[in-house]
From Swiss-Prot:
Residues 92-126 form a coiled coil. This is MORF4 family-associated protein 1. Keywords: Coiled coil, Cytoplasm, Nucleus. It is found in: Nucleus; Cytoplasm, Perinuclear region. The keyword Cytoplasm applies. One of its GO terms (cellular component) is nucleoplasm. Belongs to the MORF4 family-associated protein family. The gene is MRFAP1. Its main location: nucleus.
Length: 127
């Protein structure tokens, strides 16, 4: 460290002092405006994210309705084939019934997976 020179201490630097209005306009106003823009941007993004999630939930709800309709149609078709085998042999009706049951199980699994996905999305929305 070097020792301080007395001459250096005797001559303070001149600092320009701004009027309060100039200080506000020059420094604070730009910061305030930038913060307002950031808040508006975050608010818009929050709204868009909410709408995206609601849209996904709506799509999944429609998929669940379609799956349920398909399961019901498969069950009804299998029951109709069992009740009215017509000229078909008993073995073919049993095979069709088994296939319908397998498809119904697959669709039920898909529906369960979709329900779980919807629950996860709802849980993440609430977090």
């Amino acid at each position: 460290m070097r020792p301080l020179d007395i001459v250096e201490l005797a001559e303070p630097e001149e600092v320009e002092v701004l009027e309060p209005e100039e200080d506000f306009e020059q420094f604070l106003l730009p910061v305030i405006n930038e913060m307002r823009e950031d808040i508006a941007s975050l608010t818009r993004e929050h709204g868009r994210a909410y709408l995206r999630n609601r849209s996904k939930l709506w799509e999944m709800d429609n998929m669940l309705i379609q799956i349920k309709t398909q399961v019901e149609a498969s069950e009804e078709s299998a029951l109709n084939h069992l009740q009215n085998p017509g000229d078909a042999a008993e073995g073919r009706a049993a095979k069709r019934c088994e296939k319908a049951e397998e498809k119904a199980k697959e669709i039920a699994k898909m529906a369960e997976m979709l329900v779980e996905l919807v629950r996860r999305i709802e849980k993440s929305e609430s977090s």
